[in-house]
Amino acid sequence: MCIRDSSKSGNTLETIVNSNILIKKSDKNIFITENKKNYLNSLAHKLKSEIVHHNNFIGGRYSVLSEVGMLPAELMGLNSKSFRQFNNLIKNQKYLNALISNVGSTINLIKKRKFNSIIINYDEKSQNFFSWYQQLVAESLGKKGKGLLPVVSNMPRDNHSVMQLYLDGFKNNFYTFFYVHENNTPKINNKFILPSQNFLKNKNIQNITYAQKKATENVFTKKNIPFRSFEIKKRDEKTLGELFCFFMLETILIGRALKINPYNQPAVE
């Protein structure tokens, strides 16, 4: 069994607790932390475990494409180089134009006092990705009485809870629709379809959720609710790396426009 412990400071309480619950001396343990005196370094030396030193200028939420994220990716059999095709990104004018356009639109929405960034997520496998997004946006921008509140809604479940508020409640929200095209989703059993629902015949889960997404976007358009939409054609390392970079750069640029430091978290400290 291999346990990988990561903490930039090496003194994060939750990491220390988890370490002492999970780690056994006989395990293969790998520690990722700054090259300084801290708890994880001391524990690693005691266990004679491997230590990967983390650059102290890369904050936790920005470290996803560093060794903190790429070591476990490699252990999972993924290609870390495919995540980090930075040279291709900076030469991709379409990507850069989209980034600049989205930053400008977000700043304009903030000026209109729309402070809630709601993710309308139609991809269950991306829930952890958007947990990272919540930390990125809230911890980077929530300073000096400013910031955005990132909220993640998982669809279609939340159609039956918070969608009423999104459509007809207060108007200080803006939205990001997120969808990943999947080929191998379960298909409906035509045998049990009643005549009133014949339109469901030969459909799979992707057909249905995509139709729900498009219908919801149409309603948002009719009601003049601000939103943007991401449709991912292929789930792979390259695409995920592009998404990580996009949201990190977007957050940094918004922070600069708001004249706040997007890299620290002084109130938490």
Whereabouts are the PLM-identified features?
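Glycine-rich phosphate-binding loops that contact phosphosugars or nucleotide phosphates
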Residues: R4-Y95
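Structural beta-sheet core signal
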Residues: D5, F31, I119, Y175-Y179, ...
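A generic structural motif
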Residues: S7-N11, P72-L78, E124-K125, E182-N184, ...
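Conserved beta-strand segments of alpha/beta enzyme cores
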Residues: K28, E50-V52, G147-L149, P226-R228
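Short beta-alpha connecting loops at secondary-structure transitions
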Residues: V52-F57, L200-K201, A257-K259
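Acidic catalytic cores of enzymes that act on phosphate-bearing nucleotides/polynucleotides
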Residues: L78-S82, N92-V219
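C-terminal hydrophobic structural anchor segments
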Residues: Q206-M248
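C-terminal amphipathic alpha-helical interaction region
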Residues: N261-E269
